[in-house]
């Protein structure tokens, strides 16, 4: 089972709470996954999902909360690796039942977006978002890219969901993917907050554990890369120093150098892999890293001058 499916399974098993919260959650599930049929002055709501726990939740809420007749049917897929789908058929008795779910207004017209009456309180907003995620949401495995989304084919509902999420400062945005409107969250901290308040505590812990391990691995990689870069710089500097010392030795000889420069030059030729600090500790008396670096710069400058003189002589000849 994927991380997303495990998260939904956990959310679908949360026990029902207050009536207002249950109504908000059912309204989101029906709005996202349901279709309304009207024939001969009678109504039917068909809610289709591939999740058995979600189907059971819709069934339970519609039956216990609104006391409506409900049927549940399984549609078995014949193709390999395809999940079964479940259709929960709800039979509202009156227009008022549909109004309670925020689907129709008093005139029987379809209501756009999310009716304010369903999400007045914080607990209702959380319940509605939980229902919306159960119906149309998904979350990436935290081992990969951080991404949580809820998809809908209704642009007004997408904007309303985004605003609802951003009441909790979750940085939600909306984009288009083919004919779908995608409400998404990218920041890992915001995803953690969302999982926490909708009640996916087990998923949250797993997400956090993976995130901590990823951060540790990234930090170690950064340190290794930094150490490697520093080592490469040290090696490059040592190679350059040896080349410059050899240029001086071949041109004027090391004996022509002042004693402090000659000593460090001879040590560098003898210990080409040593660090500046290690070279300084070999001197008598010992010299600090900055002192050794100063002497090496003097040798580099002298080598450059000798190279320039050599070029002029060759050019003149």
Swiss-Prot record:
Belongs to the WhiA family. This is Probable cell division protein WhiA. Involved in cell division and chromosome segregation. One of its GO terms (molecular function) is DNA binding. InterPro entries: Homing_endonucl, Sporu_reg_WhiA_N_dom, Sporulation_regulator_WhiA, Sporulation_regulator_WhiA_C, WhiA_LAGLIDADG_dom. GO terms for biological process: cell division; regulation of sporulation. Residues 275-308 bind DNA. The lineage of its organism: Bacteria, Bacillati, Bacillota, Clostridia, Eubacteriales. The gene is whiA. It comes from the Bacteria. Gene3D superfamilies: Homing endonucleases. PANTHER family: CELL DIVISION PROTEIN WHIA-RELATED (PTHR37307:SF1). HAMAP family: HTH_type_WhiA. Keywords: Cell cycle, Cell division, DNA-binding.
């Amino acid at each position: 089972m994927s991380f997303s499916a495990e998260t939904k399974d956990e959310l679908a098993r949360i026990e029902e709470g207050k009536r207002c919260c249950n109504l908000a959650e059912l309204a989101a599930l029906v709005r996202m996954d349901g279709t309304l049929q009207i024939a001969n002055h009678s109504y039917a709501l068909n809610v289709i999902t591939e999740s058995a726990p979600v189907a059971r939740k819709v069934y339970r809420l519609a039956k216990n909360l609104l006391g409506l007749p409900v049927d549940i049917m399984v549609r078995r897929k014949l193709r390999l690796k395809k999940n079964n789908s479940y259709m929960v058929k709800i039979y509202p008795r009156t227009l008022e039942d549909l109004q309670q779910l925020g689907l129709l207004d008093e005139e029987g017209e379809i209501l756009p977006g999310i009716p304010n009456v369903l999400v007045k309180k914080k607990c209702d907003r959380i319940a509605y978002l939980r229902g919306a995620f159960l119906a149309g949401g998904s979350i990436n495995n935290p081992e990969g890219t951080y991404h949580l989304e809820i998809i809908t084919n209704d642009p007004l509902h997408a904007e309303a969901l985004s605003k609802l999420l951003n009441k909790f400062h979750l940085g939600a945005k909306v984009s288009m993917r083919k004919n779908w409107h995608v409400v998404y969250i990218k920041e890992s901290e915001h995803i953690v907050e969302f999982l926490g308040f909708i009640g996916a505590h087990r998923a949250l812990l797993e997400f956090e554990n993976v995130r901590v391990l990823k951060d540790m691995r990234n930090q170690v990689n950064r340190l290794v890369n930094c150490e490697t870069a520093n080592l490469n710089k040290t090696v490059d500097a040592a190679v350059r120093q040896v080349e410059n010392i050899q240029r001086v030795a071949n041109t004027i000889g090391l004996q022509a150098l002042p004693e402090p420069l000659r000593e460090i030059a001879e040590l560098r030729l003898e210990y080409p892999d040593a660090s500046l600090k290690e070279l300084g500790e070999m001197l008598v008396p010992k010299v600090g890293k900055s002192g050794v670096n100063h002497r090496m710069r003097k040798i580099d400058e002298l080598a450059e001058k000798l190279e320039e003189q050599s070029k002029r002589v060759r050019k003149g000849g």
